[in-house]
Swiss-Prot record:
GO molecular function: DNA binding
Family the UniProt entry places it in: Belongs to the UPF0335 family.
Protein name in the entry: UPF0335 protein A1G_00885
Pfam family, one: GapR_DNA-bd
InterPro entries, per database record: GapR-like, GapR-like_DNA-bd
Organism: Rickettsia rickettsii (strain Sheila Smith)
Length: 78
């Protein structure tokens, strides 16, 4: 491969990564804005983030986590 081709490929990779990093930053800001809007309408952002994490778990893992949490709460009288 010639140096020109290698340079062009490298520039393309770098350009793609930079574009994706900017898109990621833009999306992150949009998510923050949505949480801020939800908060201004009285929603609990911390609870919403917890729900989002729980939704990522498969049903068996979620049931296992719920059972363990209930056991610990019962043990501690909470």
């Amino acid at each position: 491969m010639s140096e020109v081709v290698i340079k062009e490929q490298l520039e393309q990779y770098i350009s793609k990564i930079e574009r994706l990093e900017q898109e990621k930053a833009d999306l992150s800001q949009e998510v923050k804005d949505i949480f801020q809007d939800a908060s201004s309408h009285g929603f609990d952002v911390k609870a919403m983030k917890s729900i989002l994490k729980l939704k990522k778990l498969d049903k068996d893992k979620l049931a296992e986590q719920d059972a363990m949490l209930e056991l610990y709460r019962d043990t501690l009288g909470i």
